[in-house]
Amino acid sequence: MGAQGFFLAVEGIDGSGKSGIVRSLAAHLGAEGRDVLVTREPGGTPEGEAIRGLVLAGADEAWDPMAELLLMTAARVQHVRRVIAPALAQGQVVISDRYAGSTLAYQGTGRGLSEAFIRTLHAEATGDLWPDLTLVLDLEAGIGLARSRRRLTGETLDEGRFESLDLAFHERIRAAFLAQAARDPGRHAVIDASGTPEEVQARACAALTPFLAQAPV
């Protein structure tokens, strides 16, 4: 359990609807009277948002995988120490749109870096802070990629570096998230992300409720 609060991460492939579910869950929990903080990775702090702009834009070959990992970790240090840990200490429910599960999936499985090294680096950088619960929004990779590319077409900010990669890459990422959930079922729930936003929200709320019932928030 994350200090006095509750730490929830929402993970999934690009186009799985994470941001919408984060907003819906925050509204739902807020209506229940809970003190909710919504954040995202990479980002969450001015320094993290600057790193986000560096890492998510440009050509895929712009960053060496190790450099990419270290940038993501640098952003997370700021995020945990300045935002997440203080909020948990104050008893808030923290909902993060991506966290370390994405690092294991994208920089580990996707880029071929050592999972053991990523976990060691994470432990040193964050005090080994992991979410109390990670919701994995699961969707066929082809559907998610098509959704994500449609969304990016209408945006001015270029955050489409990972969306430019082929379907096989995104299928590996999906498999990586599912493998994480299978290895640690006590801290993960896989949510079917197909269907309407309302249907997905209902599934997410149903998975979250028993965990929050045991939380001191």
UniProtKB/Swiss-Prot annotation:
Pfam families: Thymidylate_kin. Its EC number is 2.7.4.9. The keyword Nucleotide-binding applies. It catalyses: dTMP + ATP = dTDP + ADP. GO terms for biological process: dTDP biosynthetic process; dTTP biosynthetic process; dUDP biosynthetic process. ATP binds at residues 12-19. CDD domains: TMPK (cd01672). Disulfide bonds: none annotated. The keyword NADP does not apply. Phosphorylation of dTMP to form dTDP in both de novo and salvage pathways of dTTP synthesis. Belongs to the thymidylate kinase family. This is Thymidylate kinase. It comes from Cereibacter sphaeroides (strain KD131 / KCTC 12085).
